[in-house]
Amino acid sequence: MCELLGMSANVPTDIVFSFTGLMQRGGRTGPHRDGWGIAFYEGRGLRLFQDPAASCESEVANLVQRYPIKSEVVIGHIRQANVGKVCLSNTHPFVRELWGRNWCFAHNGQLADFTPIKSFYRPVGDTDSEAAFCDLLNRVRAAFPEPVDVEALLPDLVAACAEYRSKGVFNCLLSDGDWLFCYCSTKLAQITRRAPFGPARLKDVDVIVDFQAETTPNDVVTVIATEPLTENETWTRYEPGQWSLWRRGECVSQGKTE
């Protein structure tokens, strides 16, 4: 299985701390050696870093850790390959344009007997994850030829994710840069940090950060991960079928499918 990392914040925030913890699981404290990627939204633009190498040994990952890019929405992923060979084209997150915005997607899990819709969006690589992403966007494009608010889109997103979940394991993160959507099939956890901030210690490497010194009293930052990244904070675990929608660090909608 792979691992996911997402962030939604009300101010541009760097994710170096959480990213540093996740990267250790890419071959050092975890088995996810088959590539990694992370996407940072900057307005309507997107910075995407990917490498099919193990993240714990990747010079590109080292660059990202040394370069604290600030963003309000981030999606990251480390891969343990199930479907598709280890190569750059199979490395998450995947990105496509829809309605003049960059949509970004990362998936943890595996789908069986999945036949995607063949339409406008087509995979570049050969993973079931990218096929599901293209299938999802084709559904959205067919149902809504013109842009709509995410609140109008939510029922279609949730229904599609529930359908994918019925074919295997489908934990995912999805964003267009304004919002962050999360769906849990088996494993996801979240933490929202707000004032009063305190110190946090990573599980996978001996690193501590004092968020009090790094933030302002008005900052709200939510981090979503497959497994909790810190050992001294209380994370909330999702239940199977649970989904949530985040904007500016706050949960604006949530629910659960059967």
What spans do the regions from the language model cover?
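Residue-level signal for inorganic ion chemistry
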Residues: I38, G109, A132
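Gly/Ser/Thr-rich active-site loops/lids in small-molecule metabolic enzymes
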Residues: D128, T186-V209
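Extreme N-terminus nucleophile/cap motif
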Residues: M1-E59, A200, G241-W243, G249-E258
